[in-house]
């Protein structure tokens, strides 16, 4: 006997992917996340491909995972997907000493990234 399956937290037309413990500050990651928020997934992938930010490759990989989850797990149409949510959370902060006995310490922040894609109806279609 196991626990009952938890109810799904997303709507039926949504899929999600999460990247945890990314070695980048939340502020820098949020710059890239806000760049794709609200866009169609094809446009978002193109923007991430040509972005010069270091973390853009990891964000692209997470977005591709969300698209694959939508297609394979939830049977959503890939061409009708938009990036509904892309938000960043704080993770751990790795601390170390400065070299040569300096008095302060270096803090290396980590982040979490969550991307939710949503299937939307095309505007040209009649219901």
UniProtKB/Swiss-Prot annotation:
> In the UniProt record, does the keyword Cell wall biogenesis/degradation occur?
no
UniProt GO molecular function: rRNA binding; structural constituent of ribosome
One GO biological process term: translation
Q: Is Lipoprotein one of the keywords UniProt gives this record? A: no
| Gene3D superfamilies in the record | Ribosomal protein L22/L17
* Any single GO CC term annotated in Swiss-Prot or TrEMBL for this entry: cytosolic large ribosomal subunit
One Pfam family, please name it. Ribosomal_L22
Keywords attached to this entry: Ribonucleoprotein, Ribosomal protein, RNA-binding, rRNA-binding
**Sorted alphabetically, which InterPro entries does this protein's record hold?**
Ribosomal_uL22, Ribosomal_uL22_bac/chlpt-type, Ribosomal_uL22_bac/org-type, Ribosomal_uL22_sf
Instruction: State the superkingdom.
Output: Bacteria
- UniProt function note: This protein binds specifically to 23S rRNA; its binding is stimulated by other ribosomal proteins, e.g. L4, L17, and L20. It is important during the early stages of 50S assembly. It makes multiple contacts with different domains of the 23S rRNA in the assembled 50S subunit and ribosome. The globular domain of the protein is located near the polypeptide exit tunnel on the outside of the subunit, while an extended beta-hairpin is found that lines the wall of the exit tunnel in the center of the 70S ribosome.
The record's similarity note reads: Belongs to the universal ribosomal protein uL22 family.
The UniProt entry, under PANTHER family, shows: CHLOROPLAST 50S RIBOSOMAL PROTEIN L22-RELATED, LARGE RIBOSOMAL SUBUNIT PROTEIN UL22M
Its subunit composition reads: Part of the 50S ribosomal subunit.
Query: What is the designated name of this protein?
Result: Large ribosomal subunit protein uL22
Q: Which gene encodes it?
A: rplV
């Amino acid at each position: 006997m196991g626990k009952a399956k938890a109810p799904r937290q997303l709507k039926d037309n949504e899929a999600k992917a999460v990247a945890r413990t990314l070695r980048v500050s939340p502020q820098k990651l949020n710059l890239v996340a806000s760049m794709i928020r609200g866009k169609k997934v094809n446009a978002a992938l193109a923007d991430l491909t040509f972005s010069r930010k270091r973390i853009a490759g990891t964000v692209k990989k997470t977005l591709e995972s969300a698209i694959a989850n939508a297609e394979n797990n939830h049977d959503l149409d890939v061409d009708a997907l938009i990036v509904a949510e892309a938000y960043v959370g704080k993770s751990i902060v790795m601390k170390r000493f400065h070299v040569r006995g300096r008095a302060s310490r270096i803090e290396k922040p980590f982040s979490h990234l969550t991307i939710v894609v949503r299937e939307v109806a095309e505007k040209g279609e009649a219901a």
